[in-house]
Design a protein with these regions (language model features):
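Glycine-rich ATP phosphate-binding loop
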Residues: 1-24
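Short beta-strand micro-motifs within the conserved protein kinase catalytic domain, predominantly
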Residues: 51-62, 70
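Catalytic-loop of the protein kinase fold
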Residues: 109, 113-128
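Activation segment/activation loop of eukaryotic-type protein kinase catalytic domains
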Residues: 122-162, 166
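Conserved catalytic-loop aspartate of Hanks-type protein kinases
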Residues: 178
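C-terminal lobe substrate-recognition/regulatory segment of protein kinase catalytic domains
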Residues: 214-262
Length: 284
């Protein structure tokens, strides 16, 4: 995805560059592209969705064209510890980002006669505009639930969708699959990590972010997993009110990433709790 000028108007262009004759997903790519266009068109009016301007299927690689806000960038860039341009994401910013993405998922799950599962929510699918508003994009792996069904098989089995342990083993996705991947996104906002799998110096190897967080909680090392960059502009988080907000946020993220789908909350509850947390923050 990159920015260009189209008739003197700045736009973002995303090419489906994996479409080649020898591509392992060549047979399913057309379906993915059409799905992306259709679903994005249905939700493009939402504040937290990257606005679709159009598409072109006549290029060597099909392209999606989006509205481009100056100074917008990927969420991973804003979270990166290498970010030294002063654009730090505060605790309030991160709550707002989480709330915005939760609202989009809730809309997908509840606004259509056939609920839509986003299917591939990762931190790389989120951009942040110049006002700090999160913009979700890439609905190519979204899938509607069949009438009367609560689950559906992921036809693109070669893609690992972060939907939770059960989905990974069976290729079955549900609305709770989105809840799981959203919980992982919450953990990344909380810790400041830009990859769901990180290198752990203590273990001397790579570790999944959920396991990393749980291990530190068990060892009573809460301070070591909180991204201190959230508070550089306000000082530390010793305020009991702020600490409670952090604990509530972390608790919700862990509930979303429960092993059993039945133990995860619905997106309506997740979005409601996040809105309440966001309103309780007194500073940005």
């Amino acid at each position: 995805m990159f920015a260009v000028n189209l008739k003197e108007r700045p736009v973002l262009v995303k090419f489906y560059s994996g479409l080649t004759k020898n591509s392992s997903w060549n047979e399913t790519a057309p379906d993915r592209i059409i799905r992306d266009i259709v679903v994005t068109s249905q939700v493009s009016h939402l504040k937290n969705v990257l606005q679709l301007i159009g598409c072109c299927l006549e290029f060597a690689y099909p392209a999606m064209v989006y509205y481009y806000a100056p100074e917008s960038e990927f969420l991973t860039n804003r979270l990166s510890h290498l970010n030294n341009d002063g654009k730090l994401l505060s605790w309030k910013n991160r709550l707002t980002i989480a709330t915005g993405i939760a609202n989009v998922l809730l809309y997908l799950h509840s606004a259509f006669s056939a609920p839509i599962i986003f299917g591939n929510l990762t931190i790389n699918k989120v951009r942040i505009d110049q006002c700090g508003v999160a913009k979700l994009f890439d609905f190519g792996l979204s899938i509607s639930l069949p009438p009367g069904k609560s689950e559906v098989e992921n036809q693109l089995k070669w893609i690992h969708v972060p939907s939770g342990p059960q989905g990974f083993k069976s290729n079955i996705v549900t609305l709770k699959s989105d809840v799981y991947s959203f919980g992982v996104l919450m953990l990344m906002l909380f810790t400041g990590e830009t990859d769901a799998i990180k290198y752990d110096e203590e273990m001397g190897g790579r570790i999944y972010i959920l396991d990393y967080v749980k291990r530190h909680i068990l060892n009573n090392q809460f301070n070591q997993i909180v991204d201190q960059n959230m508070f550089k502009q306000q000082g530390n988080y010793n305020d009991p009110e702020v600490e409670q907000q952090l604990l509530d946020f972390l608790d919700l993220a862990l509930r979303c990433t429960e092993h059993d789908r039945a133990d995860r909350p619905d997106m309506i509850e997740v979005a409601k709790l996040l809105r309440q947390m966001e309103k309780s923050v007194r500073y940005s």
